[in-house]
From Swiss-Prot:
Assembly description: Homodimer.
Name of the gene encoding the protein in the UniProt record: ybdK
Molecular-function GO terms, alphabetical: ATP binding; glutamate-cysteine ligase activity
Signal peptide segment: none
GO biological process: modified amino acid biosynthetic process
Catalytic reactions on record: L-cysteine + L-glutamate + ATP = gamma-L-glutamyl-L-cysteine + ADP + phosphate + H(+)
Main enzyme class: ligase
Coiled-coil region: none
Keywords on record: ATP-binding, Ligase, Nucleotide-binding
Protein name: Putative glutamate--cysteine ligase 2
Function: ATP-dependent carboxylate-amine ligase which exhibits weak glutamate--cysteine ligase activity.
UniProt-listed SUPFAM superfamilies: Glutamine synthetase/guanido kinase
Lineage: Bacteria, Pseudomonadati, Pseudomonadota, Gammaproteobacteria, Enterobacterales
Amino acid sequence: MPLNDFHVSEPYTLGIELEMQVINPPGYDLSQDSSTLIDAVKPQLTAGEIKHDITESMLEMATGVCRDIDQVAAQLSAMQHVILQAASEHHLGICGGGTHPFQKWQRQEVCDNERYQRTLENFGYLIQQATVFGQHVHVGCANGDDAIYLLHGLSHFVPHFIALSAASPYMQGSDTRFACARLNIFSAFPDNGPMPWVSNWQEFAGLFRRLSYTAMIDSIKDLHWDIRPSPDFGTVEVRVMDTPLTLDQAINMAGLIQATAHWLLTERPFKPQEQDYLLYKFNRFQACRYGLEGMLTDVYTGDRRRLADDTLRLLDNVTPSARKVGADSAIDALRLQVKKGGNEAQYMREFIADGGSLIGLVQKHCEIWAGQ
């Protein structure tokens, strides 16, 4: 299938997707009934979209095109209210977090959707194991070449985005010792990690054509890179963040990515080259394993520095851009988070260390999402 032309969109506009957990109290395992909830919610929506994701325990909230994080907040808040009301009526819970801490992948039912069923046929049990929950942020671009530059620029900060949003320390009833275990689930997929190197949109079109020869790629949606261009939307989509426990954190991460995109496209601080990616997976691993305490290695100098310190440097660099796009409150909140030295994975471990159970942890996450 040929690649569609890159749709022109207003630069720096946002679109947010949140993959939410549908929970079945009182045991607080994942429910297998998201279809009922989605059917109940759809007629009540005034903005955005609620839809299926891979399995019946997942629900995706997606905003429309938003100018700034205030519009993102308004749309997500409205959807959250409608979903929580419907969930209560159906005796279900909703929560964030990148993984459910004790669900068993063998129990997960793939949605009755042609695309997901085809994916199940291609990837087998890997699709059931991919019952994990992420936040995706789309940023508008004026053209395909800008999108490729932006993708390469944002790739420098994949570890920072992972470390700030890490919220998946528990899987299958065990502490994984990772801050973000969710991304490990995708390591067996052939398109895991960074996009193969291209320098412009024309080269990307050639890459896509070659990938389509595998008969596993029908559209850009079948590629699960950490960051990917989305020509139909005219965006670059960042896909490495865990779904947070609160809307505030989701909005803050969106604001950071918007501000970083503005800084990258206006200042052009990097000249992308293929060597930039030589240590990409090592630095990504550090962020997944240790969060903000991970160590970044500079691919050119060999210098090593704490992710927390480099994240503060990133926040300082993008602060002027954040003011221009209306995301300065997000940068301030994330700066405070880094200085306090934590992320949501750390909070989860503290809950368990204080005597809480994994069931109690999911219950607490539902209460947090409901604002209780």
